[in-house]
Amino acid sequence: WSAATNTGNWSAATNTGNWSAATNTGNWSAATNTGDWSAATNTGDQSAATNTGNWSAATNTGDRSAATNTGKQSAATNTGNWSAATNTGDWSAATNTGKDGVAVSWGRRGKARGEKGCYLVLAEYDDSNNLVCAKMEKVDGERIKENTFYTLKNGEFAVAEEQGAGT
């Protein structure tokens, strides 16, 4: 039940326990969680928020930010430009709303969405959890729609059945 908060520039907030939260509101900040049920949030530019536990969320609202999750049922979200949202766990969702951003979801049931101009990177696995395909597409607003979660099916981008984050 820990919390670490920074409001100044060049700050770092870190949690290693469960049910934790790390928050930065200044520029050039980092917020990190390694426990389950954690949240790491940055609102400044050039920030990074990282979770390695299950049921986690990492969020950035500033430009040139990165949000990363490696646990199951996680969500990584960016609203600034030049941002990256990455998931490597199952049932994860990566969202990017900044122009020229990248949303990457490597989980078995991963999905990604973004604004027009963003790139989505997805992976597909077989029933034995072997990687079958990895693919990147640009959100063009026509073939790949804005603000729509996609997943890979048979090596092609397909609209995800569940549109909620982390489902």
Task: Report the location of each language-model feature.
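Glycine-anchored, exposed beta-strand/edge motif detector
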Residues: 81, 90-91, 97-102, 108-119
